[in-house]
Amino acid sequence: MLVMEDSYSLLETNGVSSSKPVQQLISTMIRLGVQSHTAKCLICLHLHGPSSSITLQKNCNIRQPDVSVAIAELRRLEVVKSDSSASSGRGRPSHIYQLTGTLEECIIPFIVEAKNNISTIVSAIATLEGLAQKDNI
């Protein structure tokens, strides 16, 4: 396993380590407010293609509940779709997750949310400054 600074690492697979641009992409998404598990799953799906939950756990070095939360967020943003694959024998069918577009297309919802957050913060600052200037406080 390859451990990178700030614990934004992806699991090293087949002797291939995560590149610096991949780590920068993940850390930048996290700085924008994206949950780390969500960013890791998005990038793992981009790098490794359609993957099961177990594969995402291994490639992203995260636990199953974290994969589920990340996939739910990615589905909410409509950047991931899932296909059921019949299990061999008994049990629940497993799901294969894949991106709905290119990485560039899939990061758009995250950028839009970050820009909306910026607008909200700027508006709140302006309101706060206006309220603080009034003489009736």
Provide a role label for each language-model segment.
Residues 28-37, 52, 85-108:
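Short, cationic-aromatic polyanion-contact patches
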Residues 1-32, 87-88:
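N-terminal leader segment of winged-helix/HTH proteins
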Residues 45, 56, 67-77:
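Basic amphipathic alpha-helical segments that dock to polyanions
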Residues 48, 76, 93-94:
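Short Asp/Glu-rich motifs
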Residues 29-62:
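N-terminal helix-turn-helix DNA-binding core of bacterial DNA-binding proteins
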